[in-house]
From Swiss-Prot:
SUPFAM superfamilies: S-adenosyl-L-methionine-dependent methyltransferases. It is found in: Nucleus. MRNA binds at residues 271-272. Residues 262-571 form the mRNA cap 0 methyltransferase domain. This is mRNA cap guanine-N(7) methyltransferase.
Length: 572
């Protein structure tokens, strides 16, 4: 059988029973805690924040600082003193994340628009502790102000809100006008100036409810490939670019068209399969010792829009914690989880198919410059005591952003090492430094029309501003920047080379030992026979090649070979 493909073989169904996740304890298999205990209470920490007064308004707890000790002592200027044998200080980026008050103000502004000139939103209001009074309810006309100025006379004068049935001629004329305006809007969008971070609007292109307008399926016939509108990339910091890029990605994904029409649909399926395999093989529950939480928990750093939520259900976790720098991505992840969680309700205590059976919480933050408690505790008081240490920390397609500086990498590894239990795993995917070196040594990197050095194909490319070293070994190991482009996914975003031996050496400083490292092609070829019958049918069909076999081919194969998977285990 060729190494770059897979043909499924018929096997006894009983051979795949071991694919069901079981929790290991001293080498013996056990069933899920939820299978054994039917009256178990939810692992969510949401119940702990339903108080009349927000967490940041309550009196300080004399033991509060103890929960931060394991992540390093804090000093007056806001920097963190790293532990675990590292004597460096990592500055906290003041503008890298959304503060608690800013998030509360944003939430209040969206949810509490009462009049044409509303008062400033209160910074003491949170989604979990919002209070209402009779005077705070908006009038019937002001309810529509948040959708824009529909008419001078309120809802009664807006022809779009009429419930009177229009005749066929009027309807066809209305549809014709809408199509004409849509074309003009697309032209204007392409020629408009890019917006800054503060101008990104998460509510663009929402249709006002109008039963008189028939929504045709013309949009499904055309797929709009993602393009970002980030200006002045050369002079902006990496955090600002990454945040705006993924905010725009979240916005545009809702109006691109059917996902199956994406030019990288098969490539995405391949990458998702790799992540299923990694989490399925390496994210394991272990019986808790002492006061550690007796739940199977995963910390997902740089969680994005929650693309790995299905994978966490696949391995049957109990608690999910997601952190990302993009506030719109975090909002989308929470929305995705909430909708799926509410689809089916189970009162038996057993896991239910087609729904998320785990509890989850999400937060906006930069895990490269802030500690995990600083990100989570303001919104989820007590979570560090209740849900940590975790069984696995996952960071997918994001760690390379930290290699801008050594300080950022060390800050990330402090968060990982301090969040993991002993025996827990650090699971991730990064660009392969070996792949980049091979492109350089084999002279497959060319100078483009702008004098920059580039390799890739029609699906992906990596562009260096200056000529890389002839031997492909970057010195020093940090700050080696290139611009990465992946069609319909990553639109010329700065990334940094991750010399793997440097990552390995740093992880060993934080008591994490390498257990697994393979490029994506090898992971797929070696593991897919075990997982083929377990994965979702549509995901598997998305892996089918033009010759009927399964795997990556052509330019897709080169694009996925750009990445490598790794697993580190915390030993002490």
């Amino acid at each position: 059988m060729p190494e770059d493909s897979y043909i499924p073989q018929a096997k006894n169904d009983g051979a795949f029973q071991d694919l069901k996740r079981r929790r290991a304890n001293d080498g013996h298999t056990e069933f899920s805690r939820r299978d054994r205990v039917h009256d178990v209470q939810p692992a969510s920490i949401y119940s702990n924040v339903k108080e009349n007064k927000p967490a940041w308004m309550r009196s300080a707890d004399e033991n509060k600082d103890k929960k931060y000790d394991q992540y390093g002592s804090r000093v007056d200027n806001g920097t963190l003193q790293q532990s675990l044998g590292v004597a460096k200080q990592v500055p906290t980026a003041s503008a890298s994340t959304t503060t608690v008050s800013a998030k509360v103000e944003s939430f209040s502004a969206e949810k509490a628009i009462n009049t044409a000139n509303p008062p400033p939103p209160s910074t003491t209001t949170t989604p979990s502790s919002t209070t209402s009074s009779s005077s705070s309810f908006p009038s019937s006309s002001s309810l529509y102000l948040k959708y824009g100025n529909i008419g001078l006379g309120g809802r009664g004068t807006d022809p779009r809100m009429d419930r009177v049935k229009r005749n066929r001629e009027q309807l066809e004329q209305s549809l014709s006008i809408r199509e004409h305006l849509a074309v003009e809007e697309n032209v204007n969008d392409e020629g408009s100036q890019p917006k800054g971070d503060g101008e990104v609007n998460p509510y663009l292109h929402l249709d006002v409810a109008n039963p008189s307008v028939i929504h045709t399926q013309r949009d499904e016939a055309h797929y709009r490939t993602f393009h970002s509108k980030i200006s002045d990339r050369e002079n902006r910091d990496i955090n600002s670019i990454v945040r705006q890029h993924y905010n725009e990605r979240t916005q545009q994904s809702k109006r691109q068209g059917r996902r199956t029409m994406s030019p990288i649909y098969k490539l995405r399926n391949f990458n998702n399969t790799i992540k299923y395999i990694l989490l399925g093989n390496w994210a394991k529950y272990s019986s808790a010792e002492g006061n550690a939480p007796k739940i199977f928990s995963v910390l997902d750093l740089c969680c994005g829009k929650g693309g790995d939520l299905n994978k966490c259900e696949f391995i049957e976790i109990d608690q999910y914690i997601g952190i990302d720098i993009s506030d719109l991505s975090v909002r989308e992840a929470f929305s995705r989880y909430s909708k799926q969680k509410a689809r089916f309700k189970s009162h038996s205590g057993a896991r239910t198919a087609n729904k998320y059976n785990f509890e989850a919480c999400f937060a906006t933050g930069d895990c490269f410059t802030e500690t995990v408690p600083d990100i989570l505790e303001p919104n989820f008081p007590g979570i560090i005591d209740q849900a940590f240490p975790v069984d696995a920390v996952s960071i997918q397609f994001a760690l390379h952003y930290a290699f801008e500086t050594e300080e950022k990498v060390r800050a990330l590894l402090v968060n990982v090492a301090k969040s993991l239990r002993v025996g827990g795993t650090f699971i991730g995917t990064i660009p392969s430094s070996d792949f980049i070196r091979s492109k350089i040594v084999e002279k497959n990197i060319l100078k483009d029309e702008n004098g920059k050095f580039k390799f890739g194909n029609s699906l992906y490319s990596a562009t260096f501003d200056k000529e890389p070293p002839a031997d492909g070994v970057f010195r020093p190991a940090f700050g080696n920047r290139y611009t990465y482009w992946l069609k319909d996914a990553v639109d010329n975003v700065p990334e940094y080379v991750v010399p793997f031996e440097t990552l390995r050496a740093l992880c060993e400083e934080y008591n994490m030992t390498l257990r697994y490292k393979k490029n994506f092609i090898d992971v797929f070829n070696q593991e897919i026979p075990k997982y083929f019958s377990k994965l979702n049918k549509s995901l598997v069909e998305g892996l089918k090649r033009s010759d009927g076999k399964y795997g990556a081919e052509g330019e897709e194969k080169e694009a996925v070979a750009f990445y490598v998977a790794f697993v580190f285990e915390k030993v002490t």
